[in-house]
Amino acid sequence: MICGMTYYQICWYFLIYSFGGWALEVVYHAVACGKVINRGFLNGPVCPVYGFGVLSVFAMMNTFQGSGYQLNDSMIFLFGVILATAVELIAGWLLDVCFHARWWDYSNKPLNFHGYICLEFSLIWGVAILLVVKVFQSFVEHHTSAHAPSIVGWMVVAILYALYLDRKSVV
């Protein structure tokens, strides 16, 4: 276990929230720009930055709750703002340095930091994390725990390997 989550849960949550983030990005871009495009770094339907962002919040929450702290909605929102923004900053910088490309640019937004992050989206991430924790996660937990890890585990490994191969095609 890592931060209160099994490897099985970590893989499932990463895949589910990476896909959910990709879907959110595609819908947001379709509404904002009027056309549907794949907004992900990879060719497939995932945005790993969302998976890492959600997992970082779950890890922090589990660590705090394991120490006996009760987290209220304000604390969950704050964790979402800070951790998701940190993940977005690191991911944006790494993608820029490694591939000399930007998958997002907040330079035109007020209170941005080098275009990688901005206050507006940091607050949106806080609300999104609050929704994930309070609304979606119980559904995700129920449906992922209903399957035997040994059977579905191989599916998860296959999907993660496909993501690895997808990464190789982008690089």
Give residue ranges: language-model regions:
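Aromatic-rich, lipid-facing transmembrane alpha helices and their immediate juxtamembrane interface loops
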Residues: 1-171
